[in-house]
């Protein structure tokens, strides 16, 4: 910048001796025609050369800086390709680089200003005759150009500082992300190790559970087999008991069928007994003298009574067996008939005992009541 300023300062110094030239021109009007035209042209040409050299030097420096920036950008791009997860941050940096491209476009606009300046120089060469009036305008324009170049250089310094700061921030962010990624990878490795250990534990526990379940199933099968064997034995016993009960039922039915004719015989003998009792009552008065015969007859009657009692006991046993087997209503009818038979037997016993005591009259009255029944 100091060299640019030193190159820009000779401009007004070259223009300073012009008043002397004016005075000389006034003194020597003949020499003004050649020397007066040569000095402004050389000064302006030197100024234009100095400005072009300064601009070329600035552009060269900026091109070197931009080459460095491009190298750094390429390095950043290679690093960003390794970290695909940081595309968002790279997009931010690319947006910042686009802003730098805008600044480059502004620099190109400054170059277009240089072309305009050259056009102005050519116009100045045409208007050398009017240079006396346009010196102030030229100095003002030079000052404006110096200010513009100063502003451009300051802007480039700021942009370079911002880019350096951005690269430093990006490096720090890359380091942070790299550390975070490494931490995540380490945590993932630890989780994978813990999961593998858990899987091993689960496999061992499943094997143990399978063994225990197989043992329990075998024990359950043995228990079921034992229960089945015991159940089969119980079923066999029940079948045997059923067969015995069926045989007993057949025996009881046979006995019942064998006792039925005896009962019929008893029923058949009951009217004869009743007739005999009536005949005894009728001839009781005639038979008082024949007590021996009556005693014999009573003995026979007692024997017959014993037989009847035996028959009654057998009938009672049959009744008990019939109640256990629970036959139909025919058995109930037979029970009723047996009850009537028992009543008649008891009446006969009472009659025989009354006859012995000499109470035949009372017994006859009672017998009439039973006949009415």
From Swiss-Prot:
InterPro entries: Inh_kappa-B_kinase-int. N-glycosylated at Asn-151. Residues 1-11 have a biased composition (Basic residues). Residues 18-33 have a biased composition (Basic and acidic residues). Residues 86-257, 285-324 form a coiled coil. It is found in: Endoplasmic reticulum membrane. The chain crosses the membrane at residues 43-59. GO terms for biological process: response to interleukin-1; response to lipopolysaccharide; response to tumor necrosis factor. Keywords: Coiled coil, Endoplasmic reticulum, Glycoprotein, Membrane, Transmembrane, Transmembrane helix. Residues 1-38 are annotated as: Disordered. Glycans are attached at residue 151. It comes from the Eukaryota. GO terms for cellular component: endoplasmic reticulum; endoplasmic reticulum membrane. It is a single-pass membrane protein. Shares a common promoter with APAF1 from which the 2 genes are transcribed in opposite directions. Target of p53/TP53 with pro-apoptotic function. PANTHER family: INHIBITOR OF NUCLEAR FACTOR KAPPA-B KINASE-INTERACTING PROTEIN. This is Inhibitor of nuclear factor kappa-B kinase-interacting protein. It comes from Mus musculus.
């Amino acid at each position: 910048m100091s060299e640019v300023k030193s190159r820009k300062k000779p401009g007004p110094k070259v223009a300073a001796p012009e008043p002397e030239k004016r005075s000389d021109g006034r003194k020597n009007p003949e020499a003004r025609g050649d020397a007066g035209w040569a000095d402004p042209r050389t000064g302006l040409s030197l100024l234009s050369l100095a400005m072009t050299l300064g601009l070329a030097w600035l552009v060269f420096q900026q091109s070197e800086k931009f080459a460095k920036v491009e190298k750094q950008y390429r390095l950043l791009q290679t690093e960003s390709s390794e970290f695909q997860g940081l595309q968002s941050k790279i997009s931010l940096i690319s947006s910042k680089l686009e802003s730098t491209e805008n600044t480059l476009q502004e620099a190109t606009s400054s170059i277009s200003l240089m072309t305009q300046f050259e056009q102005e120089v050519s116009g100045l060469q045409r208007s050398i005759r009017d240079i006396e009036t346009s010196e102030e305008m030229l100095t003002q324009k030079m000052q404006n150009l110096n200010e513009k170049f100063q502003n451009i250089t300051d802007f480039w310094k700021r942009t370079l500082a911002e880019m350096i700061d951005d690269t430093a921030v990006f490096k720090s962010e890359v380091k942070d992300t790299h550390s975070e990624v490494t931490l995540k990878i380490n945590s993932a490795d630890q989780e994978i190790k813990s999961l593998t250990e858990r899987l091993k534990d689960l496999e061992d526990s499943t094997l143990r559970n399978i063994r225990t379940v197989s043992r329990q199933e075998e024990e359950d099968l043995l228990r079921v087999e034992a229960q089945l064997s015991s159940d089969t034995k119980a079923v066999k016993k029940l079948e045997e008991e059923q067969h015995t009960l069926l045989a007993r039922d057949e025996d009881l039915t046979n006995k019942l069928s064998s006792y039925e004719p005896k009962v019929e015989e008893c029923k058949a003998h009951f009217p004869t007994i009743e007739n005999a009792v009536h005949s005894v009552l009728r001839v009781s008065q005639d038979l008082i003298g024949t007590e021996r015969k009556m005693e014999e007859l009573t003995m026979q009657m007692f024997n017959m009574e014993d037989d009847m009692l035996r028959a009654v006991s057998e009938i009672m046993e049959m009744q008990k067996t019939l109640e256990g087997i629970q036959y139909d209503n025919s058995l109930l009818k037979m029970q009723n008939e047996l009850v009537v038979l028992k009543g008649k037997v008891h009446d006969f016993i009472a009659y025989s005992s009354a006859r012995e005591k000499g109470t035949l009259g009372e017994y006859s009255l009672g017998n009439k009541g039973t006949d009415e029944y």
